[in-house]
Amino acid sequence: MTTNKNPGIYVHIPFCVRKCNYCAFLSGASDEALRERYVKALCEEIRIRARLMSDHAHGVFDTIFFGGGTPSLLTSAQVARIIDELKMNFDIDSEAEITLESNPKALSMESLKGYRDAGVNRLSMGVQSMDDDILRRLGRIHTAHDVIRDVQNAREAGFDNINLDLMFAVPGSSLETTLIDIEAVSRLEPEHISFYSLQLEEGTAFFKEFERGELKEVPDEIDRAMYHAGTKLLKEKGYEHYEISNFAKRGYESRHNLKYWEMAPYLGLGLGASSFIDNSRVMNVCSLDEYFNLTGKGLAPSAEVHENSEHDNVAEAVFTGLRKVEGIRYEDVLGSYEEFWEYYSDVFEEAREYEREGKLVICEDGMRLTDEGIDISNSIMALFV
């Protein structure tokens, strides 16, 4: 499932109605005036980046991804302005995949039609669960009924490519509730389902509860049982497992996210956004005041720039590539089997041990994690970093 190496664009919208208990993303509250000011600054950054990149050939951008936060807090007119600005300043493929992240209850039929008219052709909805008790525990403001209504409305508005996010291993959940969630979501027939385990992140409400002893993590063995049972059920429902946490009907894999897993270039725009362009990792500033100040002066809002070394590129290609169920091909990383394992000769025996344990498959043309290997994927990937 190797994608092309055309670049993509990520647009960060750092606003949400309310911070969820588990969320560690760069996001916060806003009003209409702040969102409008941000859209203007974002359009200015687009023009700044285009000028800075004009001396380099980057090819045709064939994905745009609005992430957050909750991008659907922007009006369809604001989303249209951003897309139009991108098209005026960059070469955007006429068949580009344009994704907008959204939350149930934050969508109206009018806004859905407006997003579709603006050029958005893929909708990603943060469902997380179809159990109202679990949704309340997560700090979500929607209900299962909201999800059903919004998916139906999205279909009526013309969306034929919808992703629904599901979360498992939430305190208060069980193997049974996890499978019930999958059954309920699959009845809505989305083209794509993301299936993530809850991670306790520092700074979140859940982490503070954990530190106070008020929250107990789901034990690892139950977390893994939920993952494997969920994966099995998703496959039975006709979804292909193509990345550790992602499942899609054939032909509906996330073209944008594949760029991250296959080391394709991408431009990040907006507060705290990261880019991988011209062999450099660039991170934008995380202060909204600083972002407004720099873009207002016609300056790129970059906080950090790191030029990748050869080892950075090799290590990142292996680390991200092993997230794909099909794994990596040596020719995409270092060339042949011999060249790859000569470069990684110091960890060859450890890799072989994982193979003997049934956690890693090493072939003449590449390697991949097994289902058991996915359970300890970070340990295996760390060998190559």
Mark where each language-model region is:
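Local cysteine-cluster metal-coordination motifs and their immediate loop/turn environment
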Residues: P14-S27
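Short, amphipathic alpha-helical interaction segments positioned at domain boundaries
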Residues: E372-V385
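Minor-groove-contacting beta-hairpin "wing" of winged helix-turn-helix DNA-binding domains
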Residues: G366-T370
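C-terminal scaffold of the Radical SAM
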Residues: N4-N6, A24-L52, V60-W341
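N-terminal [4Fe-4S]-dependent radical SAM core
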Residues: M1-I9, H56-H58, I376
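Alpha/beta-hydrolase
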Residues: V11-I13, V127
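A short, conserved structural fragment
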Residues: E355-D365
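Short amphipathic alpha-helical interaction segments
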Residues: F340-E355
